[in-house]
Amino acid sequence: IRQANRYNFSGQYMQTPSPEDGGEWRKEWFRIMDKSEIPLQSLKWELIIDGAYTKDTKNDPSGFQIGAKWNNDYVILSSIDKYLEMPELLKFIPNHISSSGVDVKLTLVEPKASGKSLVQIIRQQTNINISEIKTIFVNSSKIENARACSHFIEGGRVILVKGAWNEPFLHQIAVFPNG
């Protein structure tokens, strides 16, 4: 039963919404490296934002991930969630970029929820290079998107820069899509 359906086993027998080591993606598929092992300053960093409208913790938070391609891998410098309304979000983004310690070349925003407005306002009020994400994945479900890149992640091609954000991130990965 455990191998036939990992989610059913976790839910019925373990009383948890997702398998402990992960469902769609597994924790062990991600490598964690110290920032001293990665040429941080030579990479082209991008901030990816999945925005939300509210501070209400019953809803999804806004997600912020700074990442870059490195050789054949993808490096995530940080990935955090915040419950922010639009005025706070507009202040947070430039501060988050400047405090990252790297040169963020491009900010990409999911064009849903607050995304379209966010791009327009940031363009008007700052010098941040910002754009809507334009891929076929924007119109797909979260599960479809996860499955589309699972082979890359399962192959150990995603590196997390060691930090306090790693454990909350890996927990979200493990409980996805049920957490």
Residue ranges and their predicted role:
Residues 4-5, 56, 141:
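Generic detector of ordered secondary-structure context
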Residues 49-62:
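An active-site-proximal beta-strand-loop segment
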Residues 1-2, 57, 172-176:
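Short, Φ-rich (hydrophobic/aromatic) sequence segments
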Residues 1-51:
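ATPase catalytic-site recognition across NTP-hydrolyzing enzymes
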Residues 38-39, 57, 151:
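Generic structural signal for beta-strand residues in well-ordered domains
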Residues 16, 20, 24, 63-65, ...:
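Mg2+-dependent endonuclease catalytic cores in nucleic-acid-processing enzymes, primarily RNase H-like
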